[in-house]
Amino acid sequence: MLSRHGIRNPGKKDILNGRAIISEMKYRGASPLIVERLQSVLDSFPLSEAALLAETGAEEQRELGRRTGQRFASVFNKRDHVTFVSSTSPRAISSKKNFERGFSDGLGWNVSSSYQQRDDLLRFFDICPRYITEVKKNQTAFAEFQKFRNKMFPHVVQYVAKRLSVDSLNLSDGMLSATCMCVRESV
């Protein structure tokens, strides 16, 4: 079974962009109530916990593990040995631990297990030279995406400004993703 890590906190760049957006919103005269609500959401993500597994992500993984253990309890017996694999990412390691805890709960016993870290399988996009050269650093591979983004981004920024009751916002596209995250949480 392959599973992605649980819900995580925003990354450092997202948190910093969120702070910049709030400053921009204040400068543009956005409603203090909206700014305050967005600030409270952003404040719930300290930089020290950037990109780490959120508590809801830990609960999500425990529940997934529990349901998996219950579903496959008839397949396993107490003598079986299970290998859990994750990448070296702290949020993936935390997800594995929570999944394993839930899996044991679902089976009704502590499963005998071992653990492997395999970035070569699970984070190929960071270490595979061919992927890095041909995809990640290949500007032409993202030409359609760039074309779409360049056309649509100004409309999205204007929509966000309208929802915030301000005439305009000076946002880069990197800042917008954090704005959307905060707006979804507070509006």
Regions found by a protein language model. Give the residues of each.
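Signature for phosphate-centric chemistry
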Residues: 1-83, 87-187
